[in-house]
Amino acid sequence: MSATPIGFFGLKLVPGKVHRMDVSRDFKITNVSYADQPKSNTKTLVKIHYTHVPGFEDDYDEEEQEKEPKSTDEEEEIEEKVYTLCSLNGANKDHAVVDLQFCQEELIGFSITGDAPVDLVGNYVAPPDFFDQDPSDSELYSDDEDDDEDMYGLDSDDFDDDDDDDMDEDPDRFEELVESSASKPKKAIEAAPLADSKKRAAEKPVKETAAKKLKADASAASAASTPTKAIETKGEKQTKGAKDTKPKSETVEKKTVDKSTSKMTTTKLPSGLVIEEKSAGSGPPCKAGQKVGMRYVGKLTNGKVFDQCTSGKPFYFKLGKGEVIKGWDEGVKGMRVGAERRLTCPPKLAYGNQKIPGIPANSTLVFDVKLVEIK
């Protein structure tokens, strides 16, 4: 599938200078020409300066290689190489049509020989799709994760059935279940455990109040000769039960609200991506070239879930290599293990005008993501 153009790219090259590129977005060069009318005897070579970064190569045996450290002689050095893109001359070839695409984070530069400036023009392009096949509608909307393929090409055989039993099936949230001390309050992110604790907290005061009421009624029956005292006792117990119940409920709600709001920070990047920080995580931040393992829930803006990976084997990809949509490459960068974010990706950082099963064209996508591993 050819890359989808999403914007104009242009660069003017002047003699005697190497134009270094900070490749923040994928782009393609389609035409090379003189910037002005050249002299008939003008000759120009357009050069590409490319630096290979060893950490960016596709390597599926990283863990085994880490166990066997390389010797000094085997370590790969970073070296810049220069290649010729095309040649121009003022007599009969003042432009060249090319088709050359560069990916985000590549270390490249351009230079020219001769004394005539040259224009490079082309397009910024959308990153390639990060799944190989279009899943069917039934697969996208199936609730049984053991029978479907997620949109990233992970087969159900890759998932561990034992892990499925340990994960919360709520499609809106996800969480690695961890044992915690009973004296510490649950985090607001743990949706299912918190709901159960709220339910128990609500049921307990009701049961206590009912028991106290029955006890007060029994006291009133046995002390019929002194009705005034029985009534006072009953009233005091009911009042005390109400006072005991109210602070508990308010405390649980207050802690939940405080935790959910105090950790929420929102940032909007120039690209239009909105990042909501929900949990900071710990350890070093992830960076381009590293393989990261993710949990996620993908939704449309109307709340409809189109894909998720909340249990079993995490979804792995190499950050900054265009293996996922642009919104993920930008939004996951800098996360730490355990960190959680909500990424709101405008169409240009998702699938643009492509129509995908379950995702209409020009859709804004919302992802709740959690980083669980950095390799």
Swiss-Prot record:
Residues 55-78, 127-265 are annotated as: Disordered. It is found in: Nucleus. GO terms for molecular function: peptidyl-prolyl cis-trans isomerase activity. Residues 217-230 have a biased composition (Low complexity). Inhibited by both FK506 and rapamycin. It holds the Pfam family NPL. It catalyses: [protein]-peptidylproline (omega=180) = [protein]-peptidylproline (omega=0). Its main location: nucleus. Residues 56-66, 131-173 have a biased composition (Acidic residues). Residues 196-216, 231-261 have a biased composition (Basic and acidic residues). Its EC number is 5.2.1.8. Residues 289-375 form the PPIase FKBP-type domain. The keyword Chaperone applies. InterPro entries: NPL (IPR041232), PPIase_dom_sf (IPR046357), PPIase_FKBP_dom (IPR001179), PPIase_Fpr3/Fpr4-like (IPR023566). GO terms for cellular component: chromatin; nucleolus. It is an enzyme of class 5 (isomerase). Keywords: Chaperone, Isomerase, Nucleus, Rotamase. Binds to histones H3 and H4. PPIase that acts as a histone chaperone. Histone proline isomerase that increases the rate of cis-trans isomerization at prolines on the histone H3 N-terminal tail. Proline isomerization influences H3 methylation thereby regulating gene expression. Belongs to the FKBP-type PPIase family. FKBP3/4 subfamily. This is FK506-binding protein 4.
